[in-house]
Design a protein with these regions (language model features):
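Active-site HxH/HxHxD metal-binding segment of metal-dependent hydrolases
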Residues: 1-35, 48-56, 140-148
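Short, charged, surface-exposed secondary-structure boundary motifs
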Residues: 4-8, 126-129, 178-180
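Active-site-proximal loop/helix segment associated with metal-binding centers of metalloenzymes
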Residues: 9-16, 34-86
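Short, solvent-exposed secondary-structure boundary motifs
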Residues: 20-26, 68-73, 160
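Short loop/helix-cap segments at secondary-structure boundaries that form the rim of catalytic
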Residues: 22-23, 37-41, 160-163
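General small-molecule cofactor/ligand-binding pocket signal
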Residues: 28-32, 43-45, 168-170
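Glycine-centered loop/turn motifs
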Residues: 35, 173-177
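Cap/insert and terminal regions of metallo-dependent hydrolase folds
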Residues: 73-79, 83-90, 94-174
Length: 180
């Protein structure tokens, strides 16, 4: 990976996976492009939204290409989607491309389905109260009945989302069992 966080005007800090992992374990890695069916009912869905670099610039996430830094387009990030009898369940790590973009992408991929749950960080720790409340309104429109967030949602954003979404949202913790 070639992922970096911008520390200040001139400094970037590498924040990708440990260098060498991909080459050292190339025989164990299968690269997936586009919508990818892992097995019946389990899919990897990539970003399809154009312009995600705007989000990356706001939260200081960059990639290096030919020695130059560019805002990340998150093309390398995917969501793991399970098709269950109760609806689709989205698993994502930090949702760098925006949780509402991910929801839109999954619904476009499975237009006849509904999303029942979203599990993963929402990467809102640098978002304003207004942005978080607007996201909550968009989430309400989807009919999602369970959201389990990770650390990168941010404490302040979680409190606002809890006010707006009530029992629909809860924080993930070690050892948590998820029942849908």
């Amino acid at each position: 990976e070639n992922c970096y966080g911008k520390k200040n005007f001139f400094m970037y800090k590498y924040n990708g996976i440990q260098p060498g992992i991909l080459t050292n374990h190339a025989d164990r890695i299968e690269y997936a492009e586009g919508d990818y069916k892992l097995l019946d009912g389990v899919y990897l869905i990539p970003h399809k939204t154009v312009g995600l670099e705007k989000i990356a610039k706001k939260v200081n996430l960059y990639v290096k290409d030919n020695g130059k830094m560019f805002p990340d387009d998150f093309a390398h990030e995917q969501s793991l989607v399970f098709d269950t009898p109760k609806g689709l369940v989205i698993f994502n790590s930090c949702s760098h491309g925006g949780p509402d973009n991910i929801i839109t992408e999954v619904l476009a991929t499975f237009p006849e389905k509904e999303i029942c749950a979203y599990v993963g960080g929402l990467h809102l720790y640098k978002s304003s109260e207004k942005e978080v409340r607007e996201l909550a309104d968009r989430i309400k429109e989807t009919g999602i009945t369970k959201i389990i967030t990770g650390h990168c949602t941010g404490d302040e954003a979680f409190v606002i989302l809890k006010e707006e979404l009530g029992d629909v949202i809860e924080q993930m913790y070690t050892g948590m069992e998820i029942e849908l």
